Amino acid sequence: MKTIYKSLLLMGVCSSATAPSMAMTEEADSTHHQPLTETNVKLNEVVVTGLTGQQKLVTSASPISVVSPKQLESQPSTNIIDAISRQPGVSQITTGSGISKPVIRGMGYNRVVVVNDGIRQEGQQWGDEHGVEIDAASVHSVEILKGPASLMYGSDALAGVIVFNSAPVLPMGEMGANVMSGYQSNNGLFDYSLNFAGNKQGFVWNSRYSGKMAHAYKNRYDGYVYGSAYREQSFMQMLGWNHNGGHTHLTLDYYHLTPGIVEGERDEETGILAMPDGFNPKSYGRSLPFQQIHHYKAVLDNMWYVGEGNIKLLAAYQQNRRQEFEESRDECGLDLMLHTVNYDLHYTSPMLGAWKIATGINGMWQESVNKGSEFLIPDYRLFDYGLFATATCSINKMNLSGGVRYDHRHLHGDALVEDNDNDNADRVERFKNFSRGFDGFSGSLGMAYELLPNLNFKANVSCGFRAPNISELASNGEHEGTQRYEIGNTALKPEQSCQLDLGLDYTSQIVSAQLSLFANRISNYIFSTRLVDSNGNHVITDGSDTYQFTSGDARLMGGEVYVDVHPLERLHISNSFSYVNAVQLHQQSDAKYLPFTPAPRWLGDVRYEIMCDGRTFDHMYVKLAVDCNLRQNHYYAAGGTETSTPSYTLLNLYAGTDIKSHGRRIASVYASCENITNRAYQNHLSRLKYFDVNKATGRMGVFNMGRNFTVKVVVPISL
């Protein structure tokens, strides 16, 4: 009982809500740019996708954070997941400075669905060695749905959904362009993006080309980290037709990432990270080993108005190819090719009295093929579909929402028998032939109630479903980028989640505050654990530690709190705190906590908007921010899988201004210094934390990026 009381008390103290951006509008001007001022717009003016279709944020019973265009533009980052990782309840699993995986309330990988251009992104997201294949510059705004969101998105949305919204279509008769360029000092990151969009008599288009390159990053303990350089290129073209009866949009997207692979090997005497003779750590060129990721995407988006309702049909094709080059630049070892076809058909009714109903079907077909000489997973084929119905109802000061969904998924993995190097030895069976079918039901029921004109109470109960992915079921190979050899388990059962969310939102002219609590019970929670032999020694396969997937019942509790106080018109003081306690039930002490649980985190900042004449400079601001990660003592210790992570605090400084000429904005300039004190630290979710020990200092692993100065210029062009 004492444990329960402590957990409830901790939830009450630490729990939370959404980010400051929840109070931001999402309207953009004709150049896809927003002014720099912080506005305190009421929550009932913000419209989000939600779990049951478009609705006002204030009426959504589920916890949702919104990241505005202004925040994305002004916040320095190395990729799109890094850009949103400062939102309460959102973290990132990193492998160096350029690779990030999203984590929502302690859960990541295939438990977070990423939606872009209206469809779920499919890029072999079970892997650690690559991030989300989306150009950060192409994202206009972001919605983060926290908690089981399987109603609209199906299996895998157990932790939540991240919706990356592209820029809205320009008003009729308008054209606009945008040029962006930035630089970061620590890893020499240089990025740029060119955008041209328009709307002529209903013919709409949006074109964007972006590029990015970075050399090895550095920190106080490791110096330059060999293998952390990367290059990125992307191109997007949207063409469409808007008419009175609806719209048809075709979006073509290409993304290419070439990241290095950090191996963490050191000189035993000096502890310095090993580099090839004559290697220049500031080189932007490719150095072995490295990866190559190509992602192609074509999305056809159709919508037709039917009376006051509408029908929407989405169809998409994605091709993801991931290659690893270890010994030669011309011949890859690992070569995975994934084909995905997405489909989504749904109908949204007009208002039927106080009710609005949506129903539909969506799913995907996949085929993955090994084209290289090394293997992680077998060739496989997957098909799934989901039938869903949702409803919302507004009664006086109360808004009700809910729905049900049924999912079916079938997955078949092919056998693979390899030739043995020894002609006299038997052939080796790498993968066995197998087929699995998974069925699951999801549902939610929630309420948002206006207690007072500025105070809203929210409660939501949701149940989700997640089928095991191909890596969890059948992997048998080494992850070069994380130095792990992983073994799957074809007997794994689907995860089933049931979560309770409680929240309070308060908004006034002086204070904005959000509080969100959650308690989540998951059956058959799947994770990997390090294998040990009968003597307690780590099992080594092909030179790497060996991990195998297993499952157990889990309970996650916690929340986020956000408070923004602006006692003066130009002064904003913001604080947020995030906490999650992730426990595996019925286990001994060393296996009590789930792996990769983010540490408790406090984010605070003081922002002052400087008064200008408005003729040359406008919307000028300066902001001092603190990022404090507390010590993480709740870790999965079985087999030495994880270790405790010390606390650390980062001090950051940001500034920005609009530059005007003849009453028009001609540019926006942003500058920052992150990690001002050049603190050497490791985040608990960093994959590099568990690399080789530096025998000269006794420190384990590779540390995160040190002090980093950034500058960014955005030039809007009206045509």
Labelled PLM ranges:
Residues 84:
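Active-site-adjacent helical/loop segments in soluble small-molecule enzymes
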Residues 657-658:
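Localized edge beta-strand/strand-to-loop motifs within extracellular or lumenal beta-rich domains
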Residues 89-93:
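A short linear hydrophobic-aromatic micro-motif
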Residues 673-675:
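Gly/Thr-rich phosphate-binding loop signature of adenosyl cofactor/nucleotide-binding cores
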Residues 613-617, 661-666:
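Short, solvent-exposed loop/turn segments that connect beta-strands within catalytic domains
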Residues 1-33:
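Cleavable N-terminal targeting peptides that direct proteins into the secretory/outer-membrane pathway or into
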Residues 24, 36-42, 50-67, 71-75, ...:
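Outer-membrane beta-barrel proteins, especially TonB-dependent receptors
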